[in-house]
Regions:
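Positively charged, low-complexity intrinsically disordered regions
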Residues: 5-7, 168
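Short beta-strand-to-loop element that shapes/binds the nucleotide-sugar donor at the catalytic cleft/hinge
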Residues: 7-33
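C-terminal catalytic/acceptor-binding lobe
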Residues: 88-174
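Catalytic core and acceptor-binding pocket of nucleotide-sugar-dependent glycosyltransferases
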Residues: 36-126
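Generic structural signal of hydrophobic/aromatic residues within well-ordered alpha-helices
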Residues: 34, 61-64, 68, 144, ...
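Short, small-residue-biased leader/transition segments that mark boundaries at the very start
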Residues: 1-3
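Polar low-complexity intrinsically disordered regions enriched in Ser/Thr and small residues
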Residues: 5, 21, 33, 51-55, ...
């Protein structure tokens, strides 16, 4: 497919750019429409910056709303809400998206020296703790479990999803 046929644009999320996809923070629950098996996915895109032609972008917005509404009817919320839904769509319809490097969505607290668009820190504008709540301290066992969960468990889930041949059905109807 020619790059001109790609009517939508998404930007890679800086912390996951160039990383093995099994470490991307996709929704892996299997309950949400946004769920992506460990054996699938290539890019992790930021939910805060996307675009495209007017018609294609409006169709994308409608599809994201439809998927989110289906999840809500089933009492499910995707891990990172609309960002998770967008990542599932990128995985399902890769030919529709032009994927830009993270230079177009660089957080101001992580300058790279060649950022094209700088994203401002939320906490400068709103009180994030009042919205999300304060982080709870973790004990030794919780910290070790978190490290295992982030660094080693994805390999086991990848093996499981590969053996079970879990895949994403690719679609061209967005």
């Amino acid at each position: 497919m020619c790059i001109r046929d790609r009517s939508l644009t998404a930007v890679c999320h800086l912390p996951y750019y160039g990383k093995n996809p099994i470490f991307h923070p996709y929704d892996r629950s299997g309950k949400s429409r946004a769920s992506i098996p460990y054996s699938c996915g290539q890019y992790y895109v930021a939910g805060g910056l996307s675009g495209g032609t007017a018609a294609a972008y409006l169709a994308l917005c409608r599809e994201l709303k439809k998927r989110t509404d289906e999840d809500l009817q089933n009492n499910v919320i995707a891990r990172f809400h609309d960002e998770s839904q967008l990542n599932r769509l990128v995985a399902e319809t890769p030919g529709k998206f032009r994927i830009l490097p993270p230079d177009y969505c660089t957080p101001e607290e992580t300058p790279t020296g060649h950022e094209a668009i700088l994203v401002l820190q939320k906490s400068r504008c709103i009180n994030v703790e009042s919205v999300k709540g304060a982080a709870k301290p973790q004990n030794f066992v919780q910290r070790k479990w978190e490290a295992f969960r982030l660094n080693w468990l994805p390999y086991l889930w990848l093996a499981r999803d590969t053996l079970l041949r879990r895949r994403i059905d690719f679609k061209n109807d967005l």
